[in-house]
UniProtKB/Swiss-Prot annotation:
InterPro entries per record: Flavoprotein-like_sf, RNR_Ib_NrdI_bac, RNR_NrdI
Any one GO BP annotation for this protein: protein modification process
Function: Probably involved in ribonucleotide reductase function.
Top-rank lineage group of the source organism: Bacteria
Family: Belongs to the NrdI family.
Cystine connections: none
SUPFAM superfamilies the UniProt entry points to: Flavoproteins
Primary gene name: nrdI
Pfam family, any one: Flavodoxin_NdrI
Protein name: Protein NrdI
Any GO MF annotation of the entry: FMN binding
Amino acid sequence: MVQIIFDSKTGNVQRFVNKTDFQLIRKVDETDHVDTPFVLVTYTTNFGQVPASTQSFLEKYAHLLLGVAASGNKVWGDNFAKSADTISRQYQVPILHKFELSGTSKDVELFTQEVERVVTKSSAKMDPVK
């Protein structure tokens, strides 16, 4: 079972992850130790930047990061959910989804499918017998 770790400033990301059926959901600032692979869901701040709290968390635990999703607001144009682009590039992980504000039911469905895909792919790498 994969854990979803999220960072939320206004509550949009928390509302999004709470709509999913994932059982193990933890917030970045309430996570004192991570020792299993995880998917990160974060927000975008200022003009397309990764939040400082997310960046600090990743400095310690990026080696366990499987993929990233991000929230944003489409009024920011090219900076919409840009934190996902930055994290993906910096840590060489896939962008699983970008969603506006707290997302729609379709966003939750697409995110869930992508998480399942990346977890399956990761499991196959760890257990090459499959």
